[in-house]
Amino acid sequence: MPRAQLQRFLSGISAEGIRTVYLDPKDAAKAKLDAMHSSPSSRYVVLEGRAAKPRGKKVGRRFKILSNKDIDGVLQEAQKGLDFVITEVQDWKIIPLENMIAKLHKIHTRLYAVARSPAEVRKMFSILDVGVDGVIFTASTVGDVREALVHLGTKSFRLQPARITEIREVGDGERVCVDTASMLERGEGMLVGSRSNFMFLVHNESVGSSFTSPRPFRVNAGAVHSYTLGTDGNTLYLSEVETGTEVLVLDSHGRARRAAVGRSKIERRPMLMIKAEADGEIGGIIAQDAETIRFVRPGGGLVSVTHLKKGDKVLVHSKPAAGRHFGMEVADEYILEK
């Protein structure tokens, strides 16, 4: 990776909350990240061959695991005073890691596993309900890192109050009901909006009434043209969402988790256009005109779109406008969305 691109990548993952990278400390230091590397100047030194243990450093070794004999070798080395071990398992992943987790925890040596995909990251952390102590995940984009964080349930988005400035009937249109394969809690919903940088938190249908039964797996998200977020942080059009698509579900604190879509339903319904303003940014959404579609208020309360008034405040995710190419954000590109 070219040096300039590497520094942008490191800055991006630092903004996502990553604190340690497997990288030469000279490169990691510029992004104010801790380094794990064979260099003695790393915070976490990976010993190679017969290299001596440097004083005042956390040290470990890297191992490939192909058999039980390799696991025994890891344990023997760990008992010599290693602070951590890095293991790379091949075809069999769960059983070897279960064996090492059980044994290494007794001698207080930390276990870091190599993962090859965001889904593997989550699996590594859930083994034996204890999980490994850390994962070394090869990522080429910030989106890869975001997706891994979503799998862990540690990804969050900044939500802020936005003031409703306009509400207007706009006739019939096609709206998308997203039925997820998850039971959604009160306060959870999807980020949806007509602009990629201004999205409303649209609540799920877990709240029933005397006329409707609860549908806690469903989000009546909005018109077909609207944006929502995929698990890598890139945008999707609601019209693209279908069985098997993975979308982000957020709570009122901005904490995100992934949800698989069981089906989406596109139906023609009367629609409302709603606009709001937050920190000088103005965004809108076209949602079905029905009592069951709710936004989330600051503090976690709910308000139906049919009861909204100018001046009301609802939670949105807003940031300065940026261009997008096939859903991926493009920095420094001029764009004006209305």
UniProtKB/Swiss-Prot annotation:
Classification via InterPro entries: DHQ_synth
Domain of life of the native organism: Archaea
GO biological process, alphabetically ordered: amino acid biosynthetic process; aromatic amino acid family biosynthetic process
Alphabetized GO MF terms: 3-dehydroquinate synthase activity; dehydroquinate synthase activity; NAD binding
Keywords carried by this UniProt record: Amino-acid biosynthesis, Aromatic amino acid biosynthesis, NAD, Oxidoreductase
Transmembrane feature ranges: none
One Pfam family matching this protein: DHQS
Catalytic activity as recorded in UniProt: 2-amino-2,3,7-trideoxy-D-lyxo-hept-6-ulosonate + NAD(+) + H2O = 3-dehydroquinate + NH4(+) + NADH + H(+)
Enzyme Commission number: 1.4.1.24
The UniProt record lists the keyword NAD: yes
Protein family per UniProt: Belongs to the archaeal-type DHQ synthase family.
Record's function text: Catalyzes the oxidative deamination and cyclization of 2-amino-3,7-dideoxy-D-threo-hept-6-ulosonic acid (ADH) to yield 3-dehydroquinate (DHQ), which is fed into the canonical shikimic pathway of aromatic amino acid biosynthesis.
UniProt protein name: 3-dehydroquinate synthase
Organism: Cenarchaeum symbiosum (strain A)
Gene that this polypeptide is encoded by: aroB'
